[in-house]
Design a protein with these regions (language model features):
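Alpha/beta enzyme core
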Residues: 12-17, 27-52, 66-76, 89-196
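Divalent metal-dependent hydrolysis catalytic cores, especially in the metallo-beta-lactamase
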Residues: 50-58, 82
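Short active-site-proximal "capping" loops at secondary-structure junctions
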Residues: 58-63, 86-89
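Conserved oxyanion/phosphate-binding beta-strand-loop segments in alpha/beta enzyme cores
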Residues: 2-13
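Intrinsically disordered, low-complexity segments enriched in glycine/proline and serine/threonine
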Residues: 7, 29-30, 57
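Conserved phosphate/anionic-ligand binding catalytic regions in large, soluble enzymes, centered on
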Residues: 22-26
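A glycine-rich helix N-cap at a beta->alpha junction
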Residues: 77-85
Length: 196
């Protein structure tokens, strides 16, 4: 199936390596690391040339906030440090506060659910109309000092012609978001270049 997508060896653009071990990877049972282990891992990832390290979810706990802040402060100019949040101002503010004194490029990676089940569980049905304007407002506020990465959580389970998803994508593009992710968040619905 991947052959339908083209020959990746002939790409002329640089491919950036994003390491989510410190955030997503530690969700696996038995994979949790200490404060010092997080900093050591981040330094090793930077030393081998990782371009972006997603360091954590600062709003989750004081420890997580301190880990992200220390990684951002210790990082060199060659690596970008990302912090994750939901599309909530207080969580994005926690990311900003953890990253602001960092040395290199800083990324706030925020997400919002777009599959019907995740929307229902997260904010309830019928409460999504204001979300595109919230995207514009929050991204406008934070994009002055940070790159913004936006993930549409559960995208593969949303309806492709869903006007809400289109409105969210439009709001993100109009807000000059650096990266837009369309993930298969919980698996089972992966598609690539026309696959099913």
């Amino acid at each position: 199936m991947l052959s339908k997508c083209g020959d990746f060896t002939k790409m002329k653009t640089k491919i950036s390596i994003l390491d989510t071990t410190l955030r997503d990877g530690q969700q696996s049972p038995g994979a949790a690391m200490s404060y010092d282990d997080n900093l050591t891992y981040a330094k090793m990832a930077e030393d081998i040339g990782v371009d972006i390290i997603e360091a954590g979810f600062p709003a989750a706990s004081k420890m997580e906030f301190n880990i992200v802040k220390a990684i951002a402060n210790n990082a060199g100019q060659s690596v970008a440090i990302a912090a994750l949040s939901q599309l909530k101002e207080a969580q994005m503010e926690a990311c900003a506060n953890a990253l602001i004194s960092g040395n290199g490029r800083k990324i706030i990676h925020t997400y919002f659910p777009v599959s019907p089940d995740l929307i229902k569980a997260s904010i309830g049905e019928g409460k999504i109309g204001h979300i595109p304007s919230l995207v514009r407002s929050l991204f406008g506020k934070f994009s002055k000092d940070f790159d913004i990465q936006f993930s549409l959580e559960g995208f593969s389970r949303s309806t492709i012609d869903n006007s809400f998803v289109v409105d969210l994508l439009r709001a993100a593009v109009e807000s000059d978001v650096e990266v837009i992710n369309l993930p298969d968040t919980i698996g089972g619905d992966v598609f690539c270049c026309g696959g099913s």
